[in-house]
């Protein structure tokens, strides 16, 4: 409930100070399986044959500010191969608030980051593999010139619906 109030207050705050009209954007994705017995593969379907992962993302942009939230549902059970932490759960998975100006980019909440080819740090999401190791914290990117970016991050890795 506290997360929902935070999101509503962020959206309300950006709407009340608006000089121009912002816009909403987002998407919905649903991955569903209906499991059946397969004697050729010697596979017995589990009792809960229907499994579904659903993601609803809603973002709002107003000038230099962007706010977003992603709601996730793993009902009645998560797809096979997913962590058991997700089974039967639904909740707000990620949320963020971003401010971007000429040389500064500040993000608070959940974000993804990769340095180079990802050997030092790589946080990313691949829904088909069940990977979402977003960082929850703050990220500041300062770009003083076209060829130099200074990035500072602080946060904890997402694990299920927790950090």
Can you annotate each of these PLM segments?
Residues 20-163:
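Outer-membrane beta-barrel channel domains
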